[in-house]
Amino acid sequence: SKAHTTVEQTIEKNEDTLSRWERIYRMLTFKEKVEIALYQRVSKDTWVKSDVIPDNAKRALIAIEDKRYYKHGAIDVLGVSRALYVNAVAGETVEGGSTITQQLVKNLFLSSKRTMTRKAEEAILAIEMEHYYSKDEILTMYLNTVYYGHNFYGIKEAAEGYFGTSPSRLTLGQCAMLAALPNAPSYLDPYTNYKGAKARQKLVLEQMVDQGMITQ
């Protein structure tokens, strides 16, 4: 029928357009792909420059997610081994095995499926990310794109949404709370699981003390 033909033509046209975009995308440099991914996730109004983000927000994130961030490359083999041991002893997820760089590329480019193929892609992209960007730049990208729950993406939305303040005015306690959330934003929702969120916040602060980032 005519309608059937129209549908087929539409599908073919869409597939042709998609294939053209795929070809164009493959021709882009890695940095151009990163810029596109950031553009899709962060507006100019919500992007927070590195020098505006409190040092305690950066320290809190590193303390709980990737304590050797400035000492290792894109992949932290020692960190993965340590995380497995620490989590087993604690009986809970105290440390993650993925580096901040790995988490960033996963958020920007990959699905949430935990497969060997995806982990391999994550590792390759993380290595490429650290080839083109500094640790400080990667940390800034992470803090501007990570999901904090309640449809808050990035530290600006989270600071305003949870605390009614700007990122630059976040207190140490608020920085620790925000660093606690990306691990499990739905479960650690401060509105529905305040006790769990506070416990994770306390853990962040303890990690910061243990690593000499703050005094007790």
Regions found by a protein language model. Give the residues of each.
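Juxtamembrane regions of bacterial inner-membrane/periplasmic proteins
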Residues: 1-216
